[in-house]
Structures are given as C-alpha cells and as structure tokens.
Design a protein with these regions (language model features):
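Conserved SAM-binding motif I beta-strand of class I
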Residues: 73-78
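Class I SAM-dependent transferase core
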Residues: 1-52, 82-99
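Active-site capping/gating segments
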Residues: 154-190
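Conserved beta-strand signature within the Rossmann-like core of class I S-adenosyl-L-methionine
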Residues: 139-156
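Conserved SAM/SAH-binding loop
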Residues: 102-108
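A short SAM/SAH-binding and catalytic strip from SAM-dependent methyltransferases
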Residues: 115-134
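A short acidic, Gly/Pro-enriched loop at the edge of an enzyme's catalytic core
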Residues: 108-115
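Conserved SAM-binding loop of SAM-dependent methyltransferases across substrates and taxa
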Residues: 58-71
Length: 190
C-alpha cells in the first residue's frame, strides 16, 4: 500500500487523463484509497477468493484491495478504455500480478466470482440485476458470496427493496473525518 501512496502514478496519469476529479486529486488517499479499504476492514478475504470490481475507473476499489489481499484474484472492469488503461498501467507499475483489467461493460462479463465490489457506480437495484449472474455458488469465506458496494448520501430508497437481507455499515466505524460520515458499505448476499 505504501508504494501506491508514495508513488506519483495517479497524479501523473490524472494530468493526462481525467480519471479522478482534478479538484479531488489532493484527496486521493482519503477519498479513494482509504474509502476502498473499508471493504478490507469489513471482510478479510480468504486466499483464492475471486472478486469482480465493476466500474473500477482508475482502479478503485480493486487496486488497493489487490495490494491488501495478494492471494486473491481480481478482475477490474470498466467500459471506458482510457480509465482501464490507467488502472492497468498503475497495476503494472506496482507489480500486481493478482489482477486483470478489462475494457467491457459488466453485462459482457461471463465469469463467476465470490464477490462483486463497486464504488458508487449505479443505483443498487440496477447493479444487482447486472451482477447476479456473476456470483458463484461455491463459498470460500465466512459470509455468503454477494455484492459489496461503497456509497454515500441518503440510501434509504435505494436499499429499501433489500432491507431484510442487506447489511449496512457506516464507514465512520473505521475511519474518522467529516468525509466518511455519509459513506456506507452495503453487503447484499446474492
């Protein structure tokens, strides 16, 4: 993780391709890296766990998670080629061998995974419809396979259809600071 934080990789790429909002690049660690690591705080993935990162953009949450869990396998997908190029180049520069970056829409992804992760890509009901086909029925972890999403704001209406099965954890449980007060991790077994 230290290599990611010390490296000018994202800053350099962001000056060429707007992967992270230019006004937010100074908050890279808190708003992107640390936020992504809320998933690692919530679940210690077992070795050989497979994870699909949907709408990864520049590699979040996939790249920080791949660093934290080197014995797990990650597939990062995004439909925008320039974003996948950045994620791929950052992963290569960091020497990450446990992830693959693909330019594709999640609808095109055929593989099965233990978990699907995402950061504020689309409304939860839409995401559930798209990724349900990608969840494996072989379990490796202490919890059932499913969807783990990082989101912010008022999620009441979005989570309402899943209120009986979803587990919602505020990110402020693990991280201090005003920015995390509205951020939540949503787990939905599928």
């Amino acid at each position: 993780m230290c290599a990611l934080l010390r490296s000018p990789l994202y800053r350099d790429w962001n000056s060429k391709i707007n992967v992270i909002s230019r006004k937010d690049i100074d908050n890279l660690y808190e708003h992107h890296v640390l936020h992504s690591l809320a998933i690692a705080k919530w679940i210690p993935f077992q070795p050989d766990t497979t994870i699909l990162d949907v709408g990864t953009g520049g590699g979040f949450p996939g790249i920080p998670l791949a660093i934290m869990f080197p014995q797990c396998q990650f597939v990062l997908v995004d439909s925008i080629g320039k974003k996948i190029k950045v994620a791929s180049e950052v992963a290569k520069a960091l020497g990450l061998t446990n992830l693959v970056c693909k330019q594709e829409r999640v609808e095109e992804e055929k593989e099965k995974f233990d978990f699907v992760v995402s950061r504020a890509v689309m409304p939860l009901p839409d995401l559930v419809k798209l990724v349900r086909k990608n969840i494996s029925n072989k379990h490796r972890n202490a919890i059932p396979n499913g969807l783990i999403v990082l989101k912010g704001g008022d999620l009441q209406a979005e989570v309402a259809p899943y209120i009986k099965t979803a587990e919602i954890t505020p990110c402020s449980k693990w991280f201090k600071g005003e920015w995390f007060e509205t951020k939540q991790l949503i787990y939905l077994p599928l």
